[in-house]
Amino acid sequence: MLHIADKTFDSHLFTGTGKFASSQLMVESIRASGSQLVTLAMKRVDLRQHNDAILEPLIAAGVTLLPNTSGAKTAEEAIFAAHLAREALGTNWLKLEIHPDARWLLPDPIETLKAAETLVQQGFVVLPYCGADPVLCKRLEEVGCAAVMPLGAPIGSNQGLETRAMLEIIIQQATVPVVVDAGIGVPSHAAQALEMGADAVLVNTAIAVADDPVNMAKAFRLAVEAGLLARQSGPGSRSHFAHATSPLTGFLEASA
C-alpha cells in the first residue's frame, strides 16, 4: 500500500494521459496498467465542455485525477493554473510542473520551490516534478510537499535512470514518498526504480508511443510489482568476489 497525504493506493504505478492516439486507447491502457492515480495537463482540458474527450473517460474509469501545471514557466503561472484546476475538478491535489525551456523541459528549481511553498499554504496537496537534486527535494519536503517527483532523465527521452546516484540519496533521506518521474522508457527501468527504494514511478510516453500501448501498460504493471516484491524480499548484497553456491571440494575429499 502506498500512502500519500489523505489517500492510499494499491498500485505503485502512476500514469499520464498525453500522446495517446485516442481517448479510448488511453483508458484501455490505464486500466491495463492498474494505475489508480492519473495525471493530466490542464492546458489540454476543455473546461467549457462537460463531455471533454480526456476528462470524461477518466472520471468514468474511477481513477484519482492529478492535474498538472505543465506549460507554466513561472511560479505565478503555476499557481494560477493550480487554482483553475481546483475550481474545475474539485481537487486539491496537484502535480507542480514549471519548465521554462520548451526544448529540454527541465524543471526550474527556484520557481518550483517558490510555488510549492505558496500552494501548500493555500491548502493544496503538492507533488512537485523536480530535478534529481537531494538538497532541493529536502527543501520541498520541508515546505510541506506530500511527495517529491525527481526525474530519472529528461521528459519523454526514454533514457532510464540516468540520475540513479542522486535518486539513491533522495530516497535514503526522504520522509515523504519518492516518485521517479520522467525518462522511464522500458519496464525494466521501472523495476529498477522500485528495487532501489522508490515508492512509485510515473510513466506516460513509454506506454503511449509503444506499438501496443495496452500490453506495454500491462508490462509496466508487472515490472513495478516485481520491483517492489524484490525489494521487500531482501535481495542479497553485491560483492566484488565470487561466492560458491555449493561446495567446490567436498565431493573430491569424500571420494579419496
Swiss-Prot record:
Record's function text: Catalyzes the rearrangement of 1-deoxy-D-xylulose 5-phosphate (DXP) to produce the thiazole phosphate moiety of thiamine. Sulfur is provided by the thiocarboxylate moiety of the carrier protein ThiS. In vitro, sulfur can be provided by H(2)S.
A GO cellular component entry from the record: cytoplasm
Instruction: Show the GO MF annotations.
Output: thiazole synthase activity
- Quote any Pfam family the record assigns: ThiG
Source domain of life is Bacteria
Q: How does it assemble?
A: Homotetramer. Forms heterodimers with either ThiH or ThiS.
What pathway annotation does it carry?
Cofactor biosynthesis; thiamine diphosphate biosynthesis
Q: Tell me, which GO biological process terms does this entry list?
A: thiamine diphosphate biosynthetic process
What is the protein name stated in its UniProt record? Answer: Thiazole synthase
Q: What high-level taxonomic lineage is stated for the organism?
A: Bacteria, Pseudomonadati, Pseudomonadota, Gammaproteobacteria, Enterobacterales
Q: Where in the cell is it found?
A: Cytoplasm
What's the chief localization of this chain? cytoplasm
Q: Which UniProt keywords apply?
A: Cytoplasm, Schiff base, Thiamine biosynthesis, Transferase
- Entry's family note: Belongs to the ThiG family.
Where is 1-deoxy-D-xylulose 5-phosphate annotated to bind? G156, A182, G183, N204, T205
Q: What is its EC number?
A: 2.8.1.10
Organism expressing this protein natively: Escherichia coli O127:H6 (strain E2348/69 / EPEC)
Active-site residues, as the UniProt record annotates them: K95 (schiff-base intermediate with dxp)
Q: Which reaction does it catalyse?
A: [ThiS sulfur-carrier protein]-C-terminal-Gly-aminoethanethioate + 2-iminoacetate + 1-deoxy-D-xylulose 5-phosphate = [ThiS sulfur-carrier protein]-C-terminal Gly-Gly + 2-[(2R,5Z)-2-carboxy-4-methylthiazol-5(2H)-ylidene]ethyl phosphate + 2 H2O + H(+)
Q: Which InterPro entries match?
A: Aldolase_TIM, Thiazole_synthase_ThiG, ThiG
